[in-house]
Design a protein with these regions (language model features):
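Conserved PDZ fold ligand-binding element
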Residues: 51, 257-281
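Serine-dependent protease modules
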Residues: 1-237, 243-244, 253, 283, ...
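Extended hydrophobic-aromatic, low-complexity segments
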Residues: 238-239, 258-261, 306
Length: 306
């Protein structure tokens, strides 16, 4: 019974309201806007509740509010994010949550997306269009689907369960109520009507764990690479005949990048054993490294394969 599955999962799903401030026209005044997304409870420590979501849900937020299944809300802060994986972890202080709410919420049970079969039934739960938690059903239409966005490519699960704006960061669960994907509504295009996408939990779990375990680097002790670069997305890559990744436009003199032999015109595709496709993603990966840390950088050079 779908209603019983949803009843068991809903206490682990949250809504996320982000408030953003932008400068008004001609630089006058400040305009405030709101965004809606979803997340799910990943872990609980003595002091904090850890919540997983998509990076694009929280990346431009000045403040975040989490709504729990019982209707209560609490302020949240960003723990960390991986822009390339479009994943983030935010936290809510336990002291800001009532005992009544703490007694109702649950930590999500993670499944195994690698074991999924095409045609298997799934349920998507999230804060669709910002109107509150909603439920849609469908099947796994495809696995390992390469999907191109304006800022890179991701390998996703495809489903015919409706995943609308606001659903991003919510859960895609199997008939056991186990999370097998993280809904992603970045792709909004009339040509893909009837297709929803989710980040496989097998992919996401490693990234989310790394984010939670990342050591805070004191100001001034962060690593520094020394390049100026531009994200080379699939559209630019195809038009210019340049590989997708970070196109290096300039290398700072005497920087670690110059000493390592990185040159203008190179395209960076990997950092420390992980693929990287955007400048934002590269910056987020560098930011959790201490100065002096040695890392492997994968790149492609004209007339070479990298």
């Amino acid at each position: 019974d779908i209603s019983q599955i949803v009843e068991g999962v809903m206490p682990s799903v949250v809504s996320i309201t982000s408030k953003m401030q932008t400068t008004g026209f001609y630089g006058f005044g400040v305009q405030e806007s709101e965004g809606a997304g979803s997340g799910f409870i990943l872990a609980k420590t003595d002091d904090n509740l850890m919540i997983a979501t998509n990076n694009h849900v929280i990346s431009e937020a000045n403040s975040l509010t989490v709504g729990f299944s019982d209707g209560s809300t609490a302020e949240a802060t960003i723990v960390g994010a991986d822009a390339d994986a479009d994943l983030a972890v935010i936290s809510v202080k336990i002291k800001d949550i009532s005992d009544e709410t703490l007694g109702k919420i649950k930590i999500a049970v993670l499944g195994d997306s690698d074991d999924l079969q095409v045609g298997e039934s799934v349920i998507a739960i999230g804060n669709a269009l910002g109107y509150g938690q909603s439920v849609t059903t469908g099947v796994i239409s495809a696995k390992n689907r390469e999907v191109s966005f304006t800022d890179g490519t991701m390998t996703l699960l495809q489903t015919d369960a409706a995943i609308n704006p606001g659903n991003s960061g919510g859960v895609l669960v199997d008939v056991e109520g186990h999370v097998i994907g993280i809904n992603n509504a970045k792709l909004e295009d009339t040509s893909v009507e009837g297709m929803g996408y989710a980040i496989p939990i097998a992919t996401a779990q490693t990234v989310l764990t790394d984010i939670m375990n990342a050591k805070t680097i004191p100001a001034g002790e962060n690593a520094y690479l020394g390049i100026i670069g531009k994200t080379m997305d699939a559209q630019y890559s195809s038009a210019l005949g340049i590989p997708s990744g970070i196109y290096v436009t300039q290398v700072v003199k005497d920087s670690p990048a110059e000493k390592a032999g990185i040159a203008a015109g190179d395209v960076i595709t990997g950092f420390d054993g992980n693929s990287v496709s955007t400048m934002e993603g590269l910056k987020s990966k560098i930011s959790v490294k201490e100065a002096g840390t040695k890392v492997k950088i994968t790149l492609k050079r004209a007339n070479q394969n990298g």
